[in-house]
């Protein structure tokens, strides 16, 4: 798929890695509507701080992204380098620096090498082409083992609207947009306020429902650019068109979010924690998230041990009131716990077979209300420890 008016490029800049793409560019041939959801961590990387300011007017023309260095916890020097990289690109593209969104991912606390940008901005711009989307997806990878892209089309008011999305992330994943990056482009005609209205709930139901290790990055961001090329009637708030657009955007973000979980560092299984019977959605989510972030639960899944006691124990510290002797817990369609008590050894043996699968659903019924939520996670393997122990070496 290609979206007319957008082009892409990626080069090997040697920022940290050798012989691999690590500097990417997404470019629109004219300023377009833009919106973002950025990390809510108090510790924010330089590009995040800059983008928060630049997104205020809801307009952008380019996204410049690098991997290998997060440019986080680098002080005023890091801010200055970030501004310089944008100015270098603006000069080469002959556009306003304020219309360039910046993004970085990689090691925290190390200075970003501005020379890598000075030497490579020109070839980066020269390499712009409408079919280089997946090269940028490769350039943003760090500990990812696969690139993550999604292509989607939907009919809005009788017009085909197209979406192209990419993401990176495998570790330091528990986004709270508010390390994980996602960029989506679309040819939908939509205002900046309406784009933000669609993005906020879509992120809440997708990227903010995943966790690999419970850590929130300094650099988390989702950026969306819409150029209006589909020439649909401009999408208005509260209309069917707005609902259709949000649904399509949420589809793309969910596809990318689940790919991040499936590619979690060292992961061998993707796990859905579904909590029902809660009094409120927030309580259901909190219980699900607490279980999903439990290291003991995640290692039990890796060991293919149907240790439901760890799940119930994690639920008990979620800060949500419930009666333990009303809780049911199932792995897939196998009930292990009914009214807070073990069903029996034969049920555990059957559940153990389910744990050998690559995708597992844990169903928890609190029997306190009618609200349900899901959180998506993965297991903790020996490789997770190795990957993170060796990350900077």
From Swiss-Prot:
<keyword id="KW-0055">Arginine biosynthesis</keyword>
<dbReference type="GO" id="GO:0004358">
    <property type="term" value="F:glutamate N-acetyltransferase activity"/>
</dbReference>
<feature type="binding site">
    <location>
        <position position="142"/>
    </location>
    <ligand>
        <name>substrate</name>
    </ligand>
</feature>
<dbReference type="GO" id="GO:0004042">
    <property type="term" value="F:L-glutamate N-acetyltransferase activity"/>
</dbReference>
<keyword id="KW-0511">Multifunctional enzyme</keyword>
<feature type="site" description="Involved in the stabilization of negative charge on the oxyanion by the formation of the oxyanion hole">
    <location>
        <position position="105"/>
    </location>
</feature>
<dbReference type="InterPro" id="IPR016117">
    <property type="entry name" value="ArgJ-like_dom_sf"/>
</dbReference>
<protein>
    <recommendedName>
        <fullName>Arginine biosynthesis bifunctional protein ArgJ</fullName>
        <ecNumber>2.3.1.35</ecNumber>
        <ecNumber>2.3.1.1</ecNumber>
    </recommendedName>
</protein>
<feature type="binding site">
    <location>
        <position position="393"/>
    </location>
    <ligand>
        <name>substrate</name>
    </ligand>
</feature>
<feature type="site" description="Involved in the stabilization of negative charge on the oxyanion by the formation of the oxyanion hole">
    <location>
        <position position="106"/>
    </location>
</feature>
<feature type="binding site">
    <location>
        <position position="168"/>
    </location>
    <ligand>
        <name>substrate</name>
    </ligand>
</feature>
<keyword id="KW-0963">Cytoplasm</keyword>
<feature type="binding site">
    <location>
        <position position="388"/>
    </location>
    <ligand>
        <name>substrate</name>
    </ligand>
</feature>
<comment type="subunit">
    <text>Heterotetramer of two alpha and two beta chains.</text>
</comment>
<dbReference type="GO" id="GO:0006592">
    <property type="term" value="P:ornithine biosynthetic process"/>
</dbReference>
<dbReference type="InterPro" id="IPR002813">
    <property type="entry name" value="Arg_biosynth_ArgJ"/>
</dbReference>
<dbReference type="InterPro" id="IPR042195">
    <property type="entry name" value="ArgJ_beta_C"/>
</dbReference>
<comment type="pathway">
    <text>Amino-acid biosynthesis; L-arginine biosynthesis; L-ornithine and N-acetyl-L-glutamate from L-glutamate and N(2)-acetyl-L-ornithine (cyclic): step 1/1.</text>
</comment>
<dbReference type="Pfam" id="PF01960">
    <property type="entry name" value="ArgJ"/>
</dbReference>
<keyword id="KW-0068">Autocatalytic cleavage</keyword>
<keyword id="KW-0028">Amino-acid biosynthesis</keyword>
<comment type="function">
    <text>Catalyzes two activities which are involved in the cyclic version of arginine biosynthesis: the synthesis of N-acetylglutamate from glutamate and acetyl-CoA as the acetyl donor, and of ornithine by transacetylation between N(2)-acetylornithine and glutamate.</text>
</comment>
<keyword id="KW-0012">Acyltransferase</keyword>
<keyword id="KW-0808">Transferase</keyword>
<feature type="site" description="Cleavage; by autolysis">
    <location>
        <begin position="178"/>
        <end position="179"/>
    </location>
</feature>
<comment type="pathway">
    <text>Amino-acid biosynthesis; L-arginine biosynthesis; N(2)-acetyl-L-ornithine from L-glutamate: step 1/4.</text>
</comment>
<dbReference type="GO" id="GO:0006526">
    <property type="term" value="P:L-arginine biosynthetic process"/>
</dbReference>
<feature type="active site" description="Nucleophile">
    <location>
        <position position="179"/>
    </location>
</feature>
<feature type="binding site">
    <location>
        <position position="265"/>
    </location>
    <ligand>
        <name>substrate</name>
    </ligand>
</feature>
<comment type="similarity">
    <text>Belongs to the ArgJ family.</text>
</comment>
<feature type="binding site">
    <location>
        <position position="179"/>
    </location>
    <ligand>
        <name>substrate</name>
    </ligand>
</feature>
<dbReference type="GO" id="GO:0005737">
    <property type="term" value="C:cytoplasm"/>
</dbReference>
